[in-house]
A protein has these predicted regions:
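A recurrent flexible, glycine/aromatic-enriched loop bordering the glycosyltransferase active site
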Residues: 169-194, 406-414, 426-442
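A conserved hydrophobic helix/loop-capping motif in glycosyltransferases and polysaccharide synthases
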Residues: 12-26, 30, 37-38, 49-51, ...
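A conserved acidic beta->alpha catalytic loop
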Residues: 33, 51-60, 81, 322-329
């Protein structure tokens, strides 16, 4: 529990808010930089450090550094423990109250972050801008210690900045002669932003949000017609870390782009001879599962394409679960099963995910590869190498999804990826938004992981396996491979609706919990087409992890 704050100093001109959660390692540099501000006396500003459910010595570390600067007024506040946005709001509300008590509407409410170091003139430049009439100010944010980022990440950030800058300039009204340029850069972030107390009151304060509160603050300013000045003279350097304290923000963006750069592969980079060497060195066994469906578009062609891999010894077995009423493919060395004979205690096969689950039960390989025989492709061996390559070359990878090199064409899983899966992922699981085709039916994984995951019996498995794998081993253990073009299989619109329903059901169970799903009790899918009204019961139940049986 923090002590009550003393009254503000009569000459107070600015309050600096610093939200912090477990920042013991970095907060010292932040406070040190704030203590050494030029062009302003220590009596004219104060620092409000908002401790947001810290479990380390963040507060003590900050106080220790502040003690080396006797004139610095550092006050500790308790945040609600609900994220950086809520903590920042606590600090801003306190700052507004303190400046208002002095009847100082022109006083500055400034914000930075505990992992950020401001320049020596950071405050004085902003106060000078406010004295000229600026109501809101965004600082320029640079990355420090970014040498460890994967190649291309810093370039991506710079390119995004240039695009944002052009968009910003297109929306700005021309400034009058002699007026300063309002947008010398594009940023307005919690790491460096400021607004006057009067402006804070005018927009109704900072919205209570766990993250991205700075973006919503910018929108609030725009709605009120409050111009934001973005001078390059206001600068800070923030951490280039990939694990942040907020659910959204710079660290998450850097982590996502770093993952895309580091964990996206191309099937052309993996040759048979090299993978054979990797397999022999690791003594890893490999199974391929080809779940046949009601219509056999390309099973025999796929089996023929895989012969070269089985003869070479890269693939140890090919497992083909077939529906009772479907065609029974020629062997070609494959182990062909009636899928009802696999795990018969669970009754008849209920759908796509159920077939995957039963195929996995018959596969003995330490790595299991799932290919889609319904999409005819004479390059299935090439695609198999692309999915197996990352798992054979990097032991820390556990799960790999494939994607086509061509853009989505509105067919099949590509359409569902764009219309259903991608919005869901970006909304609830943004760390996975780098997957190009999150619903791809071509994937590979280590059996130990796959056997620990539940399988929705229907098409929901296409997304649930990705979500569950990320939850179990982390996104760093997941990868994707560009497999090259593959013809999409047309899917009737009604079938896409059923698939979307199954995907949404599986995603809801993982996003909001099984209890929420049970309370909602998924019912039939109603289909009002051509003046008719019918219902279809979509299979949404789940098979238990094989490792639990």
């Amino acid at each position: 529990m923090t002590a009550p704050l003393p009254p503000p100093h009569p000459t107070l001109r600015a309050c600096v808010i610093v939200p912090a959660r477990d920042e013991e390692a970095l907060v010292g540099s932040c406070i040190e930089a704030l203590a050494e501000q030029d062009g302003i006396s220590l009596e004219e500003y104060e620092v409000l450090l908002v401790l947001d459910r810290c479990t380390d010595a963040t507060g003590n570390r900050a106080l220790k550094v502040a003690a080396q600067h006797p004139g610095l007024r550092l006050h500790l506040l308790e945040g609600p423990g609900r994220g950086a946005g809520h903590a920042r709001r606590v600090g801003m509300e306190e700052a507004y109250a303190r400046l208002s008590s002095l009847e100082r509407p022109e006083g500055l409410i400034a914000s930075t972050d505990a992992d950020t170091v401001v320049t020596p003139n950071w405050l004085s430049v902003q106060l000078a801008a406010a004295a000229r009439g600026a109501k809101a100010i965004g600082g320029h944010i640079e990355l420090r210690d970014d040498a460890g980022l994967p190649r291309g990440v810093s370039g991506w950030r710079a390119e995004q900045g240039r695009l944002r800058q052009r968009e910003l300039h297109a929306t700005l009204e021309p400034t009058g002669e002699g007026e300063p340029m309002r947008a010398e850069h594009w940023q307005f972030s919690g790491a460096s932003l400021a607004l006057t107390a009067a402006t804070y009151k005018e927009i109704g304060g900072l919205e209570p949000r766990a993250a991205l509160e700075d973006e919503y603050l910018e929108l609030a300013l725009l709605r009120r017609g409050v111009p934001i000045e973005r001078p390059l003279a206001v600068r800070v350097a923030t951490s280039a870390r990939l694990v942040g304290r907020a659910s959204r923000g710079l660290a998450r963006d850097l982590a996502l782009v770093s993952w895309v750069r580091s964990n996206t592969y191309d099937a052309r980079d993996f040759g048979l001879d090299d993978l054979m060497s990797k397999k022999h060195a690791s003594k890893t066994s490999i199974s391929v599962v080809l779940p046949a469906r009601q219509k056999d578009h390309g099973m025999d062609a796929t089996l023929d394409a895989l012969v070269s891999l089985t003869k070479a010894g890269l693939v140890d077995e090919v497992v083909v679960p077939c529906p009772e009423s479907g065609p029974f493919p020629a062997g070609n060395g494959a182990k062909v099963y009636r899928d009802a004979d696999l795990m018969p205690g669970f009754g008849p096969v209920r759908g796509y995910g159920d077939a995957l689950w039963r195929g996995l039960s018959a596969a003995g390989g330490e790595i299991v590869l799932f290919l889609d025989p319904d999409a005819p492709d004479d390059r299935q061996a090439h695609r198999a190498l692309g999915l197996l390559g990352p798992l054979l070359c990097w032991e820390d990878l556990r799960f790999v999804k494939g994607f086509s090199a061509e853009p989505a064409d509105g067919q099949g899983s590509q359409a569902l990826s764009e219309l259903m899966a991608r919005p869901l992922i970006n909304l609830y699981h943004p760390e996975l938004s780098g997957f190009v085709e999150p619903l791809s039916s071509e994937f590979a994984g280590r059996r130990a992981l796959l056997a620990s995951l539940p399988f929705p019996v229907g098409y929901g498995a296409s997304l649930s396996l990705l979500l569950d794998a990320a939850q179990t081993v982390g996104v760093h253990a997941l990868a994707q491979t560009r497999l090259g073009p593959c013809p999409a299989t047309p899917v009737p619109l009604a079938d896409l609706g059923e698939a979307a329903y199954a995907i949404l059901t599986a995603a809801t169970a993982r996003t909001h919990g099984d209890k929420d799903l049970d309370d909602r009790a998924p019912g039939p899918l109603f289909l009002p087409f051509d003046g008719r009204f019918k219902s279809h019961r979509v299979a949404v139940e789940e098979r238990p992890p094989l490792g639990s049986l």
